[in-house]
Amino acid sequence: VAGMAASKLLILEGISGTGKTSLPYSFSRYLYNPATIVSVQPSYRDRSELLGYFNEFSKRFNETEFLRALYEANYREEPTLIVLDEMNLARIEYYFAEMLSVLEMPSKDEWVLDLVPTAWEGDPVKMDGGKIHVSDATWFVGTANNDDSTFTITDKVYDRAMPIELNERADAFECDPQPACYVTT
């Protein structure tokens, strides 16, 4: 939780089976807003994998689960967690570069992503002029395995993130269900 105060991008890294994905998922359920889990694919090469793209043939924007989560976060007060599961299966700088740049902007008013060059009549309400605002209540949590099937996370990414190492498997335990906690940012 303290890492969320330091950065909008948390990276949970370590060996398989340490709960890197289930930790943010469980935490977000506790906050009354289940996380969106995006499974990063080795084929991710650019921003369209996360943000979608405008199809010139159909004249429609093909949105992604990631983009829907960003959009919905603009309607919520609760913290929104978007989990990039196994984020280093592809080069992070390729598909997440624009988001890294946006989150570095000093003013939250500048946290805006250009999705399409011109606005269309059917654009969602929170998409203004083909752009979408990244809510201050949004955090990105990347999970990363350290093995031969993954890419090394570069200093460019580490400089903008709060890395947390999880290298030991914990013993399973039982606990009583707890009521969710309502938190706003």
Where are these regions (language model features)?
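AAA+ P-loop NTPase catalytic core and its hallmark functional loops
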Residues: 1-184
